[in-house]
Design a protein with these regions (language model features):
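Aromatic- and carboxylate-lined catalytic core of secreted/periplasmic carbohydrate-active enzymes
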Residues: 40, 342-343, 356-472, 480-499
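Solvent-exposed, conformationally flexible loop/turn segments
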Residues: 22-27, 476-478, 486
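Extended acidic/polar, glycine-enriched regions
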Residues: 49, 55-117
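Active-site mouth of glycoside hydrolases
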Residues: 51, 90, 109-321
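Positively charged n-region of N-terminal signal peptides that target proteins for export
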Residues: 1-4, 252
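Sec-dependent N-terminal signal peptides
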Residues: 4-13
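Non-catalytic, glycine-rich low-complexity segments
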Residues: 19-54, 59-62, 98-104, 419-427
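Catalytic-core region of carbohydrate-active enzymes that cleave or remodel glycosidic bonds
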Residues: 290, 306-380
């Protein structure tokens, strides 16, 4: 265990820059020595103000054990930043300095933000098309399995992963003990929720940084209802939960690839609307960077019009309502759970690969994004959805094919045609680009309407076989073309630029 702790520290030190020059959207870390007596997690207040010209960003510090305090800062603008600490402990107060923020290196696009109301983009305005996956408790597995998970996701197109902070207990599929526990104490003796365990959080943030290296966003689930009395880590009261949140946020809000998911199936948990609002306000107070933030539903719906909700994180199989949700909330829609590809007996875990791919295409062509999960029976109960490891399904490569289609679409001006009941879904950019998806129908012909005064080239796309076949000729106005008469086919039209 001691060797593992030292390894985690080494990796974090190499990833978090403790220097006076950092590139934009990376992490500057200030390390200070202070008191370890009493309860440093609650007795010591520590923060810093970072200034650049007329801008100020306030960052909370945190206790990292053994008398060490840290303040982490992600500069979002190049230039010479100055900082000054503030603390109720003289030893930590009024520490001043400066850092130079340089241009970001290749591949560093900054954190993901909302783009054009319904879409996502990095801070440098590079579009981000989320194709996510679900791997709830992968960080709480043995090192060998964690490394296998990272290798697997690194060889897919998945660029967002839904993951829980706390370990998970769910039936036979996942109930293992984590390598670290989040607080001092034990289930038998009771947890001291006012004393976080730095080793646990170092391990967690190490995994986020490893995801960052392979270009994957960490959709961090802060609360979940899947303890069922195994550890009683879900027994925090409101004050304890607020301290847990503020501590975690101080540690990882400076990581550019973090998203906040307040809870998974929030309505199953015994918390009031007032409590959820309090926790959202904790995020708003302690996250100076405004990371993306949402909440995931079971049966009941949260009020997504609240200002702290940046996008919808929805569990549903009723994809025909996507356009209504877009129009109602004026926010991006992410179908973060639409049932998983797999073969377990639970009704949420036995989609065919074909239907998983179909739901991704329907979501995209209705103006949303979708998230994958996989639950194939495994002799050692290593299911991707819960523990990670390897992927066995047939949908990931076809989701990668869809991601390619997304990146080839116009970056601006694309919207879904509101066509609620028909199987055909349409995503268009007026007079320039059209994508028609026919779902699980098997029609032998496509009938589409194009602007009469413009000429278009057409392609037939097979979403399952991952082929793109050009249609000979140029097309305008009312157009009919043959289709192969099987499901999961789309037609793409691109205007011919006469210039």
């Amino acid at each position: 265990m001691k060797k593992l702790t030292l390894l985690i520290c080494f990796i974090l030190i190499s990833a978090i820059i403790d220097a006076r020059q950092v590139e934009q959207y990376t992490i500057f870390e200030l390390e200070l020595k202070g008191p370890s007596a009493g309860n440093p997690f609650t007795d010591v207040q520590l923060s810093a103000e970072f200034r650049l010209m007329n801008r100020s960003i306030f960052c909370e510090g945190f206790y990292d054990g053994d008398g060490i305090y840290r303040i982490r800062f992600m500069p979002d603008q190049t230039g010479e930043w100055t900082y000054s600490t503030k603390s109720n402990i003289p030893q930590l107060d009024s520490k001043k300095g400066s850092i130079k923020c340089t241009n970001p290196s290749a591949g560093n696009h900054g954190p993901v933000k909302i783009r054009n109301t319904f879409d996502f983009g990095y801070a440098d305005e590079t579009p981000f098309y989320p194709v996510g996956t679900t791997c709830y408790a992968w960080v709480h597995q043995p090192e060998e399995l964690v490394n296998q998970t990272l290798a697997t996701i690194g060889n897919t197109a998945f660029n967002k992963i839904r993951m829980t902070v706390m370990p998970k207990n769910y039936d036979v599929y996942i109930n293992n003990e984590p390598p670290f526990y989040p607080f001092e104490g034990s289930k038998e003796k009771g947890w001291d929720f006012f004393r976080p365990n730095p080793d646990f959080f170092r391990n967690f943030e190490r995994r986020i940084l490893e995801l960052q290296k392979i270009g994957v966003e960490a959709d961090v689930i802060l609360f979940h209802p899947y303890d069922f009395g195994k550890w009683n880590l879900d027994k925090m009261n409101s004050e304890e939960a607020s301290l847990y949140l503020s501590y975690l946020i101080a540690r990882i809000s400076s990581f550019r690839n973090v998203w906040w998911s307040m809870a998974n199936e929030y309505d199953i948990m015994r918390k009031t609307d007032e409590e959820w609002e309090k926790y959202f306000r904790v995020i708003q107070t302690y996250d100076p960077y405004g990371h993306l933030c949402s909440i995931h539903n079971g049966m009941a719906w949260y009020n997504h019009s609240k200002p702290w909700i940046t996008h919808l994180s929805i569990q549903t199989a009723y994809l025909q309502d996507i356009q209504d949700w877009r129009e109602l909330y004026k926010k991006p829609v992410v179908i973060d759970e639409c049932v998983y590809e797999g073969n377990i007996p639970n009704d949420w875990g036995n989609l065919t690969a074909e239907e998983m791919v179909n739901r991704f295409w329907i979501s995209y062509c209705r103006g949303a994004y979708c998230t994958h999960g996989e639950t194939y029976i495994h002799r050692e109960n290593i299911l991707w959805w819960s523990k990670g490891g390897k992927l066995y399904g047939k949908s990931p490569e076809r989701i990668a094919f869809l991601h390619r289609i997304m990146t080839e679409a116009p970056a601006e001006g694309v919207y879904p045609l509101h066509n609620q009941w028909n199987k055909e879904t349409q995503l268009i950019k007026d007079r320039e680009w059209y994508l028609y998806y026919y779902g699980n129908s098997q029609q032998a012909m496509a009938r589409i309407m194009l602007p009469k005064e413009l000429k278009f080239r057409l392609e037939v796309i097979d979403a399952w076989n991952m082929t793109i076949t050009p249609v000979a000729g140029e097309f305008s106005g009312r157009t009919e073309i043959p289709l192969p008469g099987r499901p999961y086919v789309a037609v793409r039209a691109k205007v011919i630029n006469e210039n």
